[in-house]
Amino acid sequence: MLYIVATPIGNLKDITLRAIEVLKSVDLIACEDTRHTKILLDHYSIKTSTTSFFQHNRFTKGEYLLKLLQQNKNIALVSDAGTPGILDPGYNLINLAITNNIPMTFIPGPTAFINALVLSGKPTHRFIFEGFLPAKAQAQIGRAHV
């Protein structure tokens, strides 16, 4: 089973009890940066082994993680902050799981763009999310509308 686990985006206390429970019970945690995730795991005394899964190893590590999932191992996928699969390489493992009929479950939690949307004070019944703005200021012109 692949557990897609949202993690705090700033305050370590912004994590669900279910997320802590899952992170303690799985066989392995796949994370963008093991050093970053270790801070969260240490805070909650979670001793589960971790492995890195990031942009530059997503193909080789993805195949390794897929083999473990096919051996009925339970793996939690986390991002450095927020929800895996949103603007991070987690979508690659999620896609592999879907393609290979691996069961998945989602452990919801913080998502930065939802927080920004709510804090905008604007109506939230319709919105478009296009990811990160371009790095150059000139390219940002006309892209962000609130």
Language-model segments: residues:
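Beta-strand/loop-alpha-helix module characteristic of Rossmann-like adenine-cofactor folds
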Residues: 5, 115-143
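Short, acidic/small-residue loops that bind anionic groups at enzyme active sites
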Residues: 96-116, 127-133
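Short glycine-rich anion-binding loops that position phosphate/pyrophosphate groups of nucleotides
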Residues: 9-10, 80-84
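Glycine-rich, flexible N-terminal cofactor/catalytic loop recognition
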Residues: 1-55
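Short Gly/Thr/Asp-enriched flexible loops that form oxyanion-binding sites at enzyme active sites
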Residues: 85-100
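Conserved helicase motor
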Residues: 51-60, 132-137
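Loop/turn-to-beta-strand initiation segments
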Residues: 1-2, 72-76
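Short phosphate-binding loop-to-helix
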Residues: 55-70, 89
